[in-house]
Design a protein with these regions (language model features):
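Zinc-dependent deaminase
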Residues: 1-6, 67, 73-125
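Short beta->alpha transition motifs characteristic of CBS
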Residues: 22-29, 88
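Conserved Nudix-box catalytic region and its N-terminal flanking loop in Nudix hydrolases
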Residues: 31-34
Length: 125
């Protein structure tokens, strides 16, 4: 995801489809004063533009941190099939746990699509 100076909210995300990076970005919430510009939503937006479609079926989203519900929903609407993240929400300095439902539970409850959610800690990655 390239080099970037550390900032308090330094989140990154990469979208991969057919073994090719089609979108990547960082969190822009504070610099743009826009609460929707999380790394995941920004990377999905770039991936859709680069891929030429709003449908990213078969893509994987890799994130530095566990996606929030907004980002999970955006991934679902974009057709992303797999989400992999390194740092769980409960491990973050700036926790944003808005619900007691895990992403894995939420993914299992979806009736209109299947999304695999994997936590691969940094020590393992």
């Amino acid at each position: 995801m390239g080099n970037r100076k550390a900032k308090p909210y330094n989140f990154g995300a990469v979208i991969v489809k057919n073994d090719e990076i089609i979108g990547e970005d960082f969190n822009h919430v504070h610099e743009e004063q826009d609460p929707t510009l999380h790394a995941e939503t920004s990377a999905i937006k770039k991936a859709c533009k680069n891929y030429g479609s709003h449908n990213l079926d078969g893509a994987t989203m890799y994130g530095s941190h566990e996606p929030c519900l907004m980002c999970f929903s955006c991934a679902a609407w974009a057709g992303i099939d797999r989400i992999v993240y390194a740092v769980a929400a409960s491990e973050q300095k700036f926790s944003y746990e808005f619900t007691d439902v895990s992403l894995q539970d939420l993914a299992r409850k979806l009736t209109w699509r299947t999304i695999s959610v994997e936590h691969i800690p940094l020590e393992v990655a």
